[in-house]
Every structure is written in C-alpha cells, then in structure tokens.
C-alpha cells in the first residue's frame, strides 16, 4: 500500500491509519475538496484501505478516482443497513462524478399519503421531505389512475385541505360538504369520524398500494360478516360494495406467478458501445404484476453488470416503503470482487423481520419472470436509442443535409475529412487532414504529415496525395475507424485519382465516398464520373465544402511554414562549427529562436549544452559582431 500512497498528502496517510472498524460511509475528496466518490462499508478501515493496495485490481474509472483523491471523510453508522441508506442519500445529494449515474424518476407521479391529521391521499409529482409517505413512482400513469379510482371507490377519505386540528373540530369551525352527503367522506371535520377510525382506513389504503389486495379483501369480508351479525346491514352493504370494487380492480391485474408470492424482480440490459443501460423492476404482489418501473443508467462503459445491478437494487430499497418476501435478479452482484450483498441483506432483514432471499434464478417460473423483465429493459434501451436518433437528426445542420442531398448520399455526412498538400517550390512538402463533425471543426482530430516520398525540390502533388491517403486510411483499416462519412480532396481529377488509387490499395475505398473540389471553378469531381458536378455558388452544400477545403489548406500551409521557419532557425545555428542538428534542436527548444540563443550568456548556454559548446557559441557570436579592422592608408 505504501507505493500507492507515495504521492498522497500526509493527512490522508494518517487518516487511513486511524480509520475505525465500524460500518459507515466514506467520501473521497480531490484537491478542491469536491466529492469524487461515495461508498459504504461494513468495516470502514478495511474497505477504504483496499483502494490503496498495490495488488488490488480496479477498473479504469476507480483507478482515476484514486489518483485524484487527496482526502477522505467518513460517517460512522450503527449498522451496515444504515450505511446503505446514508450512502444512497449522499449520492443523490452530491452527485459524485465516479459513482454509478442512475437517472432519477422525479418526472414520474407518486401517490402521496400526507403527513397530517386525517391524511389526504392524492397524486403528486413532487416529493417533499415532510414525513409524508410516497408510493411509486408510476411510469404508467394509467395504472396510477386506476389505483386512485380503486381507492376512491373502496374508501371514504377526505379530499379537502382543511386544517383538522382537534381544537378547530371541537369549536365547530367547519360544516359538512357535498362529499359527505354523497357518501364519499365520513366528515371527520365535524367529528363524525374519529382519528383512530380514519387511520385504520389509511392502513387499509397502504395495503392496497402495496399490492396486498387479497389480504385486504379478507379483512373487509370478516368485517362485513361482523356487521351483518350485528344487524348493521347498511354498513355491511357498504363493505360488500368495497369488496366488489377491490375484486374488480384485482381482476385487472395479470397473474405472473402461480405461488401468489410477493416478490420484486430486477433486470438489467446494458449497451456499453452507446454508454447506456436500463434497469427494470417488476413489482409482483400476491402473484400479480402491480407495477413496473425503470431507470436509465449512464457512464456504464467501465462498470460491470454486477456493480450496476447492486447499485440499482440498493438505490431502490434505500427509499422503499414496502419490502417483498423474495428478490429476483438478472445478474449476481457477488460476481464483482470488491462488493457483496451483506448491507442489502441486512436492510431487508431489518424491515421484514426475517431473512429475505436474493436469488438469480436459472430455470423455471422465476427465471421466466427475470427474462421477461430483461426483455423489457432491452426494449427501454431500444426506445431510448430511437429517441436519441431523432434528437440527433433534429440537430443536423442544414448545410450537412444539403450536402448529402447534393451528392445523392444515403445519409447526411456528419463526419467529413478534408485533405490538402502544401510545399514551397517542391521543398518541405507536407499534408494535412482536418475533420468536421456536424459542420464544425473538430480540431482535436486534426493531423499533419511530413511527406517522405517526394524528391526535395521536385513538386509532385499526386505522389504526396497518395502517401497521405495511404498513411491515414491504412491506420483506420487496422484500427477499424473512426470512419468519415465523406472525404474531400483539395484538387481536381488528378489528386482525386491518386487518392482513389491508395484507398483501393489499403482496402478503404468502399467504406465512404470521396470527392475532389477543384479551386478554379469550384467543380466537384466524383470517382468514375467524366464530368464534374457544379453546385450553386450560394448553396449551403458548396459553402460547407469550401469551408472544409479552405481549413485543410490553411492547416497544411501553417504546418509547412512552421517547418520552414524551424529549418531556417536551425540553419543559422548549424553555421557554428561543432554545433550539429541535435544540439541546434536542443538550443531552439530551450531558447525559442537563434536570436535568443545569441542573447544568452555563457552560463545559461552551458546549462543546456555544456561549457565547451557554450564557449564555442559565444566565441562565434563575438567574432561575427567584432568591428572590421580600420583600413590603413
């Protein structure tokens, strides 16, 4: 561990030595005190110290995080389950860069049981930390509306926002409203219903929201029988109607499990090439599917499926208000060497009062459920990609669309390479390749090439074009991209033919279209066409081609001039006896120019090239500046 900590501040090393062995949450900080990563641990000392062990294998994301970390903060908790919940809250609040990015469901609606006397039950899209209970979120709004309809038809609950304090009710501040007269509310506002009786109804609502429909129907049937035995036939009839409404609601739900168990089914589908994943949850209550929800996951390229599924499940149960008898997963979280399910198991055990099995089924009805959830996750990713493609298409500039249409291309050329050759009378021949994405220069992908195949002093644009095209696209073939959608050659038929020859030779000709743009009349040449294409001078397509061509020309000329200037500077230093190309390059790298070398004192020169060569340089400039001897008559 010491080797990893060599470059770390002493305060971090001391903290690692003093970490407690309790469960808790740890936060790694960078040199600006920004939180890089939040994690939980059963044993803080052991867990945090593993990040700095030389032998520990880490993915690239965590490796970078550890390199940036200069401090660690900890929060000790009583149990590992508490650490899990705290970790979840900290990640949501701080959004650390190196944690798994779970996109939030804040836009989906919830059903809220308000934290107040005689609680209201209503739909909301805003979750407040006010002690209220929230059920959801509901990705399918129609299912939520069906649930609310069932609640209204089964239970007599208030819908008003009156402040029903005991004092105001006893003071008679309120009058009954229409909802009481049509038997939708028992009028707690005027004391016709006690708080205890109302809260008993709320407990029944919670059972319905948690999918415990059969249990609730059994309770209502027992109560109906008691009321009937007591000759309270009106109340018994009301309870009978409640049971019927619940039965009608229950029959709308699909049976997906013949053992009628309560279980949650989590599945994951990830497409790392697109850096997108989706987790799906099926909520199965009494064997019936009562809800489905999903979360998209970003920044998944370097995260294992085991890590992602555990983050998904822990994130969910840290905020859940119902815990099932069994949890089914599409991937095993324990496959990741640096994590386990201990905290999750402890949390579920605390909430349920007994061990909750966490399984990855391989066959049978449960495996079928997991496969169905996985198919839904894959479908969600497909829908996301479709929407992403639509958004991408909407962002394509008009000039790109116009160019694709002008060249009869199947799709707009969103990535365009522009190639040009430059020389000075056949000397210092160079080439450039510029890249445009969506009509915008992508300068990080620009490249320059020193041409080696031409004879110094003999101009040969065709040979130079063949060399640059061969070098650039042979490498693309070897690395399989990134491929352009179009290549623009600065020149006419000759330059285009040279480029096509090399593209065929390296096996890249069929990968993308290539055209030549001649300067004289701005004609567009295509391989195999005897006549050029003329685009309207004011067309966005031609203007984009000119922009690419001119940028390639500018970049090539700039590089060629830079090389000439460097050679000119070096040639002055090479006139000094004993100074060769390597020494001249070293001097220019240190001082920037021959003039600066000339101005430097011998001591400064000696630090770069040694005292002997420093003396040679200063002697040379002293001699060249010495005044000519006076003429004698």
Swiss-Prot record:
UVR domain residues: 214-249
UniProt cross-references to Pfam families, sorted A to Z: GIY-YIG, HHH_5, UVR, UvrC_RNaseH, UvrC_RNaseH_dom
Subcellular location: Cytoplasm
GO MF annotation list: DNA binding; excinuclease ABC activity
This protein's UniProt keywords: Cytoplasm, DNA damage, DNA excision, DNA repair, Excision nuclease, SOS response
Domain GIY-YIG: 21-100
GO cellular component, one term: excinuclease repair complex
Disulfide bridge map: none
Family according to the record: Belongs to the UvrC family.
Subunit structure as annotated in this protein's UniProt entry: Interacts with UvrB in an incision complex.
Protein name per the record: UvrABC system protein C
Gene: uvrC
């Amino acid at each position: 561990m010491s080797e990893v900590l060599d470059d770390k501040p002493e305060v971090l090393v001391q903290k690692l030595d003093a970490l407690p062995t309790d469960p808790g949450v740890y936060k790694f900080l960078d040199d600006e005190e920004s939180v890089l990563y939040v994690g939980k641990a059963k044993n803080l000392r052991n867990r945090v110290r593993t990040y700095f062990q030389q032998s520990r294998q880490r993915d690239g994301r965590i490796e970078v995080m550890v390199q940036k970390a200069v401090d660690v903060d900890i929060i000790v908790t009583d149990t590992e389950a508490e650490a899990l919940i705290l970790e979840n809250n900290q990640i949501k609040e701080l959004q650390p860069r190196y944690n798994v990015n779970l996109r939030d469901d804040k836009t989906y609606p919830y059903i809220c049981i308000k934290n107040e006397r005689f609680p209201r039950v209503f739909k909301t899209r805003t979750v407040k930390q006010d002690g209220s209970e929230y059920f959801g979120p509901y990705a399918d709004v129609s299912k939520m509306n069906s649930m609310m309809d069932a609640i209204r038809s089964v239970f007599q609950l208030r819908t008003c926002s009156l402040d029903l304090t005991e004092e105001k009710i006893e003071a008679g501040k309120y009058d009954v409203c229409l909802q009481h007269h049509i038997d939708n509310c028992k009028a707690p506002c005027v004391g016709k219903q006690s708080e205890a009786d109302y809260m008993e109804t709320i407990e029944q609502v919670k059972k319905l929201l948690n999918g415990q429909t059969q249990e609730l129907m059994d309770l209502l049937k027992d109560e109906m029988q008691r009321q009937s035995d007591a000759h309270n036939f009106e109340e018994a009839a009301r309870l009978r109607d409640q049971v019927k409404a619940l039965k009608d609601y229950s029959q709308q739900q699909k049976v997906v499990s013949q053992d009628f168990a309560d279980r949650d089914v989590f599945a994951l589908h990830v497409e790392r090439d697109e850096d997108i994943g989706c987790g799906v949850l099926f909520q199965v209550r009494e064997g019936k599917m009562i809800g489905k929800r999903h979360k998209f996951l970003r920044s998944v390229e370097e995260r294992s499926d085991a890590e992602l599924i555990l983050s998904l499940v822990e994130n969910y149960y840290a905020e859940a208000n119902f815990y099932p008898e069994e949890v089914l997963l599409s991937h095993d979280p324990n496959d990741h060497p640096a994590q386990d399910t201990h905290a999750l198991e402890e949390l579920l055990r605390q909430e349920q009062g007994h061990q909750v099995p966490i399984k990855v089924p391989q066959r049978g009805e449960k495996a079928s459920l997991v496969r169905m959830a996985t198919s839904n996750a894959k479908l969600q990713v497909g829908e996301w990609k479709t929407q992403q493609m639509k958004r991408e298409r909407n962002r394509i500039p008009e000039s790109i669309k116009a160019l694709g249409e002008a060249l009869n291309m199947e799709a707009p050329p969103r990535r365009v390479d522009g190639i040009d050759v430059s020389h000075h009378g056949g000397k210092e021949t160079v080439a450039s390749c510029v890249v445009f994405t969506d009509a915008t220069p992508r300068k990080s992908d620009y490249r320059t090439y020193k041409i080696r195949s031409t004879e110094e002093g003999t101009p040969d644009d065709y040979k130079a074009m063949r060399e640059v095209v061969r070098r650039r696209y042979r490498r693309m073939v070897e690395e399989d991209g990134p491929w352009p959608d179009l290549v623009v050659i600065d020149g006419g038929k000759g330059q285009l033919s040279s480029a096509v020859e090399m593209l065929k030779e390296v096996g890249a000709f069929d990968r993308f279209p290539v055209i030549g743009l001649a300067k004289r009349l701005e004609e567009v040449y295509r391989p195999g066409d005897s006549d050029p294409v003329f685009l309207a001078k004011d067309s966005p397509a031609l203007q984009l081609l000119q922009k690419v061509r001119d940028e390639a020309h500018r970049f090539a000329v700039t590089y060629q001039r830079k090389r000439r200037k460097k050679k000119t500077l070096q040639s002055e230093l090479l006139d000094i006896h004993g100074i060769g190309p390597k020494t001249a390059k070293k001097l220019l790298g240190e001082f920037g120019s021959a003039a600066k070398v000339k101005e430097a004192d011998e001591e400064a020169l000696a630090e770069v090239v040694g005292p002997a060569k420093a003396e040679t340089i200063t002697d040379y400039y002293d001699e060249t500046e010495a005044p000519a001897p006076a003429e004698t008559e």
